[in-house]
Design a protein with these regions (language model features):
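Active-site loop/oxyanion-hole signature of alpha/beta-hydrolase fold enzymes
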Residues: 31, 40-83, 87, 244
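Conserved alpha/beta-hydrolase catalytic His-Asp/Glu region
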Residues: 117-118, 134-189
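Short beta-to-alpha linker loops that shape the active-site pocket of alpha/beta-hydrolase fold enzymes
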Residues: 45-50, 112, 230-231
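Flexible "cap/lid" loop of the alpha/beta hydrolase fold
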Residues: 93, 97-98, 103-133
Length: 253
């Protein structure tokens, strides 16, 4: 499956859903550090990204969830844990809604919450312009990593997003993760699985305070881990610490 990157051969099966600027190949060093004997990880491309860049789609929350379950079926996975980065965490929640009996655990890394994301006019303009403007993509990544990292680091993430994503799909996914509200659908299944919420202290958009106001309000049993030296992209900024936190959690569920 060219659109799914797999790592490891362990018994605990994990599906990783990438973020807006990511792809199946855009997980930083996380795949390098995972315990390959404990878990089998699968990182699919969303429609419009990577191996599916030219595949048409609606680019909605519901569609991503359907596609994710289809990937699990292709892999022969009846049960699995979900790890979602950024917008991928919102889509992972819809998978939980659609198939709660198949989800073993849920991990949010800098995750977009279930509800709609409130943005002021300036913020919305910045994000909606990112589909067409490289400078907007740079500004978003720089801001969400604390305006503290080398320009080459930020520009590398920008270039990856430009290389792997279709512009129209990228544009559509903003509306999916920002405007769609699935909180009411999530509420009835919020206590069905263990949940880990990982937030970077330098993430100006979805940091610890945002996580406490959203994820921890919806999921009564959620655990919060704050990575003190990370922003929105801990798989690039502090990958070893991220993997340690995620694997400690997955080993318990």
């Amino acid at each position: 499956m060219d659109d799914v990157r797999t790592v490891g051969t362990g018994p605990h099966r994990v599906l990783g859903l990438h973020g807006w600027f990511g792809s199946s190949q855009g997980w930083g060093q996380l795949p390098d550090y995972v315990d390959r004997s404990a878990c089998t990880w699968a990182f699919p491309d969303l429609r419009g990204y990577g191996g599916r860049r030219d595949e048409a789609g609606e680019h909605t929350v519901a569609e991503v969830a359907r596609d994710t379950l289809a990937v699990a079926d292709r892999l022969g996975w009846d049960r699995f844990s979900l790890v979602g980065h950024s917008m991928g965490a919102k889509y992972a929640q819809q998978v939980l809604v659609d198939a709660p009996d198949r989800v073993r655990a849920l991990v949010s890394i800098s995750g977009v919450p279930a509800g709609a994301v409130p943005l002021d006019e300036q913020g919305r303009s910045l994000f909606t312009g990112a589909a067409d403007e490289r400078a907007n993509r740079y500004a978003i990544i720089d801001m969400t990593t604390g305006n503290r990292l080398p320009a080459a680091f930020v520009d590398g993430l920008v270039q990856h997003s430009l290389d792997v994503s279709d512009v129209e799909a990228f544009r559509d996914y903003f509306h999916a993760f920002c405007d769609e509200d699935i909180a009411a659908a999530v509420a009835p299944v919020a206590d069905r699985v263990p949940v880990l919420v990982v937030a970077g202290a330098h993430d100006a958009a979805l940091g610890p305070d945002a996580a406490k106001a959203t994820w921890l309000q919806i999921y009564p049993n959620a655990e919060l881990v704050v990575l003190a030296e990370a922003g929105h992209y801990p798989m690039y900024e502090t990958p070893a610490l991220l993997v340690a936190a995620v694997e400690e959690f997955l080993a318990r569920v």
